[in-house]
Amino acid sequence: MPPAAAGGQASPVAAGGQAGGAAGGQANTEYVLTLSCPDRVGIVHAVAAYLHQAGCNVLDSQQFGDRTAGQFFMRVHVESLRPTATTYRDLYSGFVPVAAEFGMQWELHDTAVQPRVLIMVSRAGHCLNDLLYRRAAEALRIDVPLVVGNHPDLAALAAAHGVAFEHVPIDRRDLLSAPRAEGRLLDLVSELSIDLVVLARYMRILSPELCAKLPGRIINIHHSFLPSFKGARPYHQAHAHGVKLIGATAHYVTADLDEGPIIEQEVARVDHTRSPEDLAAIGRDAERIALARAVRWHAEHRVLLHGRRTVIFR
């Protein structure tokens, strides 16, 4: 979860998963610290001094001071030079007074712990296939225990990647169907210890109540570079209007439909020679590329939320 979405300090379990290192009893040596706070002199010095005192070597550090908002953002990737003596909990508890001094919203993540991701789909499989392929190729370090679909169409695709599939139908004629489906989703998030929900062309609108329960933990992909063309067949509408750019946006889901903080956007230039089918194919590529980047950056703790905006440390 991005730091600003956490509402304060994350607990050791919530921020890094398994306190003390990787599974199997082996002490992990690498951690990612993310933080945001009101900007002032001395933040970088205080963070660096603490990490040095804790026996950590900085592998990568990025920071950004937003002069307009007066906010400071930082991501530090470190390795512990004494992993058997300094555990995750040690690093976490030792940083608490530093964070308190500067009023930080922060998280500490164990890089050995892969985020657990639940993917939700409808009938289009291009984004799901791309995410599961990248996962299998280890280009995307996430753990996907389950795919959920409001239609059963993609069960075979999930099975081909060795991932379980659950059909959670929604009947538009039944007013209680959608609330039941969202209740099941929340149960799965809890039962499977899900860190992130990805809407990989899931064609249902989530309720404001559900969005409020998972702030900063749901990523959606849609053709938002076609904002003038609402509803069905947006690429056919775009073709009729002669658009020159099409694309897709990956964003966090909020109660405001398709208006959550943007993580990534992918665009492609097109011209009059492209058919509606061409535009749809190009759009599908843009969707899978933007979504994969957004999920990877979230999984690598590169996204920091600040209101309706995001800071991305690539």
Predicted regions and their residues:
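Intrinsically disordered, low-complexity terminal tails and inter-domain linkers enriched
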Residues: M1-N28
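Short N-terminal helix-initiation segments at or just after the protein's N-terminus
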Residues: M1-P3, C56-N57, S61-Q62, L91-S93
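Compositionally biased, intrinsically disordered low-complexity segments enriched
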Residues: S11, G20, N28, F64-G65, ...
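Solvent-exposed loop and beta-edge segments used for protein-protein assembly and interaction
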Residues: A27, Q53, T68-G70
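Short glycine-/aliphatic-rich beta-strand segments at the starts of folded cytosolic domains
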Residues: A27-P38
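Short amphipathic alpha-helix segments
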Residues: R40-D60
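One-carbon transfer enzymes
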Residues: G65-Q71, R75-R314
